[in-house]
Amino acid sequence: MNISNSQVNRLRHFVRAGLRSLFRPEPQTAVEWADANYYLPKESAYQEGRWETLPFQRAIMNAMGSDYIREVNVVKSARVGYSKMLLGVYAYFIEHKQRNTLIWLPTDGDAENFMKTHVEPTIRDIPSLLALAPWYGKKHRDNTLTMKRFSNGRGFWCLGGKAAKNYREKSVDVAGYDELAAFDDDIEQEGSPTFLGDKRIEGSVWPKSIRGSTPKVRGTCQIERAASESPHFMRFHVACPHCGEEQYLKFGDKETPFGLKWTPDDPSSVFYLCEHNACVIRQQELDFTDARYICEKTGIWTRDGILWFSSSGEEIEPPDSVTFHIWTAYSPFSTWVQIVKDWMKTKGDTGKRKTFVNTTLGETWEAKIGERPDAEVMAERKEHYSAPVPDRVAYLTAGIDSQLDRYEMRVWGWGPGEESWLIDRQIIMGRHDDEQTLLRVDEAINKTYTRRNGAEMSISRICWDIGGIDPTIVYERSKKHGLFRVIPIKGASVYGKPVASMPRKRNKNGVYLTEIGTDTAKEQIYNRFTLTPEGDEPLPGAVHFPNNPDIFDLTEAQQLTAEEQVEKWVDGRKKILWDSKKRRNEALDCFVYALAALRISISRWQLDLSALLASLQEEDGAATNKKTLADYARALSGEDE
């Protein structure tokens, strides 16, 4: 029987096609695959180029990619590459292990941005992934902002974490959460995000849940809660280059005999003091090649996340659930000098101190519950203003609080570093929906204030609360005075939410209804109340009050300090909430709204308070130097001598 060459070639083609479905690549760990394939795109990386796993990332990534570890929690600071690790492991799951994957981010906007700036460029820059994406760069049902379906049949979803519907109808092998601490505690009264999300992997042969976040407030932080449910909490231990003793790096403080130490006011002098033998260690001396993660609860350890050992050194099965902690001191993307500089910037500012603890140390912040400023002490902090608008004020904003029988407005002046001065207090009595009352509010909005040189300043931006009244009243006033000048607002009591989140588009009522992070604003304001100016020296963040009983008195001070943080159980969860205890707090609310108006001006219109003040002072100087004929006559007659 003769077979032609063309028949042989056709047979070879069909045999290969039939066997192709049986082909499996040689197994690789997540780190092996990432080092061989992963590429950091220019859109979402400080430095574009091929991925190279760092020593402290090795065990974390391999644990994420392991089929034997069901839950991985990562409690971390900023600048350790968590999102990049997560995305690299997801690419590994899709291309190498052929798994269905899903990741949630705190909001729909976060998810959309992550898909555009991280996921899509990563698909483009990894050839093996791009080969599975014939739809790349095209409109296609398998290529949307929430889902990518690859030609190997595997799907990847990227969704916001606020809506309960985003936790339904998906059957995946891998569920991931980026910045878990920023998620709502209870998703539309249906449960915690990890409880809802992990339901999506219950039918998988190899279920995997990956959670990571910079932590927030102790006792209410979701990544802290997830970590506490894991039996293993791993910290990265490195040997001292001088005595050889292992330890994990600690920031330390004045009372701690080890950790980062430096000469006062000289960050460049920083070194690490070994906790075992007081050896002086410089950052460049540490070698992380053989460093290992050790559990502070059980003593088990691993170097690579593949092989695990008991505290006595015997090899054991990988744990079902594990938590890793890593912080900035280990990162080559930062320096110990910069850590010290950042720490020094937090002096006297509790808000900055909390940010440092969360984002640099990767630790939860322990809130001081029940403390509030002393109103009587604050009431004595009156100052003589040189004019209705003090010299260092560059910009005026106002906040309006709505009540059924009145409107209350406070005008605040702002200088460089957000130093602030209370400029005016207006209480407009009358029915909230009466036009005559609203006309008097109009007058207050359009009132001008005088600088020392006689120049008039108007209120540049006003945030007006819609709570408790018909919001269309505020909407119409916004249209009357200017959509960008009078901005309707509503409060959002969510920890960590920006002071102001102004939308890019108008709502269906034709206005820019803006959410205010009231908790964040109040915390910042209370921190600033602790700053005490010395004489007339500028002090960023300091708050000033006029020696004018029509504007500032004990009642105003009491309202500014009316609220305190309290612990409450809400739907079975402990939360830290701001509570006025039924004390009047209109002055504080107005301050919050005025601060929000300033932040909108900075974020949306790039307001630069320092540059604006310099410009105003030039105008003040020019006005001061202008002389009238009468001035010259007095000078010539000797009257000015």
Predicted features along the sequence, with ranges:
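Anionic group-transfer/hydrolysis microenvironments
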Residues: L180-A181, Q403, W412, G467
